[in-house]
């Protein structure tokens, strides 16, 4: 019992006096490793080997962690730079598309080709037709809001009106081609969807029309499916509409000049595209610059506290 107490006092003194715990020998008798965890050599007490190796391992692990963090954080400005450059390319593509679209819409009207396959390369191209309407087979695409061409060009695709209504789509027999097509006559407010409320605007007899060629519209997310049996149309589906009305799958938007008093308001083609890529370019390049500066301060200049 006395021997154990003596060894306990010895260990407390070694812990209290750091100079005794150095790597060199100390003038004490040998102590078993199983009691204190010290290594023994020639009867001398030595500092445990694992203390020195643990310090070196900790320093190496810290250096490895710093290296990983350095390259991981560099990924943020690199990604932001890549996204900014991608938006530059997207903006060039969008400007080219807008210019092409504007040139098509402003072109002189051409006679409507009778072959639907030929129309696939003519979307947004003005065409001219002559014939008469069949108002007994009207279809309604709704809900829709009215497009004001002047405001549409200014607001670049935003809704031009808050009033909800429908587009009136009417079969039109082309007397010169011998085919029947679908014509979007234009917008009517919800209270005027019923044709009985707008008899004055139901055009009779042969007329000349200028319209914009349109193709089938892809259904957007959250837009319901069309229901031809119940005559519910939410987006433009040429094949389904043609089958329902017995017409050819050819569709044009009548221009604003086709508008008659009391009838649908023509010119309901959205010919502008929203171009917000410059905002994205500024955002991504700004994020790249900010994160690059912070990374430089942290890992290159080694600013304290950063």
Swiss-Prot record:
InterPro entries: Surf1/Shy1 (IPR002994), Surf1/Surf4 (IPR045214). One of its GO terms (biological process) is mitochondrial cytochrome c oxidase assembly. Its main location: mitochondrion. One of its GO terms (cellular component) is mitochondrial inner membrane. It is found in: Mitochondrion inner membrane. It comes from the Eukaryota. It is a multi-pass membrane protein. The chain crosses the membrane at residues 68-86, 280-300. It holds the Pfam family SURF1. PROSITE patterns: SURF1. CDD domains: SURF1. One of its GO terms (molecular function) is cytochrome-c oxidase activity. Keywords: Membrane, Mitochondrion, Mitochondrion inner membrane, Transmembrane, Transmembrane helix. Belongs to the SURF1 family. Component of the MITRAC (mitochondrial translation regulation assembly intermediate of cytochrome c oxidase complex) complex, that regulates cytochrome c oxidase assembly. Component of the MITRAC (mitochondrial translation regulation assembly intermediate of cytochrome c oxidase complex) complex, the core components of this complex being COA3/MITRAC12 and COX14. Interacts with COA3. This is Surfeit locus protein 1. The gene is Surf1.
